[in-house]
Amino acid sequence: MASKFKQVILDLTVEKDKKDKKGGKASKQSEEEPHHLEEVENKKPGGNVRRKVRRLVPNFLWAIPNRHVDRNEGGEDVGRFVVQGTEVKRKTTEQQVRPYRRFRTPEPDNHYDFCLIP
């Protein structure tokens, strides 16, 4: 790729020389292009990348089965659906946060005997 950029720069300088010999003025754009191409050549990819904050899904209704049931009838089923809905919310949130949560290991009994951190 570097050779392509160098070839383009060489072609632009040749065109500029031809225009100067003819007495015509080279356009401002053609003067800036070689400089711009050199800048692009020196840049490293991925230098200006920001991390995005992952947002949790606000609507969990898609995961609740039988959501078109009439809420006034059913008695015991209503409580079961409510519990099931809260479990679905908890599980999906847990799945989304899992890559960001570190492993939590309990401290051994003698942890403070060997721990150097005050």
Swiss-Prot record:
What conditions trigger expression of this protein?
Up-regulated by cadmium in testis (at protein level). Up-regulated by curcumin.
> Where primarily located?
cytoplasm
Q: In which tissues is it expressed?
A: Expressed in both Sertoli and germ cells as well as interstitial area of the testis (at protein level).
Which stretches of sequence are listed as region Interaction with SIRT2? 30-88
Q: Which InterPro entries match?
A: BEX, TF_A-like/BEX
Interaction with alpha-tubulin, as annotated region: 30-118
GO biological processes: chromosome segregation; negative regulation of protein ubiquitination; negative regulation of tubulin deacetylation; regulation of mitotic cell cycle
Quote the PTM field: Ubiquitinated and degraded by the proteasome.
- Annotated residues for binding of Zn(2+): C115
Q: Which UniProt keywords apply?
A: Cytoplasm, Cytoskeleton, Metal-binding, Nucleus, Ubl conjugation, Zinc
Compositional bias, Basic and acidic residues, is annotated for 28-44
A GO cellular component annotation here is: microtubule
Its domain of life reads Eukaryota
Give the region (Disordered) as residue ranges. 14-50
Say yes or no: keyword Zinc present.
Answer: yes
Q: Does the keyword Nucleus apply?
A: yes
Q: Which GO terms describe its molecular function?
A: alpha-tubulin binding; metal ion binding; molecular function inhibitor activity
Compartments it resides in: Cytoplasm, Cytoskeleton, Spindle pole; Nucleus; Cytoplasm
**What assembly does the database describe for this protein?**
Interacts with alpha-tubulin. Interacts with SIRT2.
Family assignment? Answer: Belongs to the BEX family.
- Role noted for this protein: May play a role in microtubule deacetylation by negatively regulating the SIRT2 deacetylase activity toward alpha-tubulin and thereby participate in the control of cell cycle progression and genomic stability. In absence of reductive stress, acts as a pseudosubstrate for the CRL2(FEM1B) complex: associates with FEM1B via zinc, thereby preventing association between FEM1B and its substrates.
Supply the name of the protein: Protein BEX4
User: Which organism is this protein's natural source?
Assistant: Mus musculus
- Lineage of the species this protein comes from: Eukaryota, Metazoa, Chordata, Craniata, Vertebrata
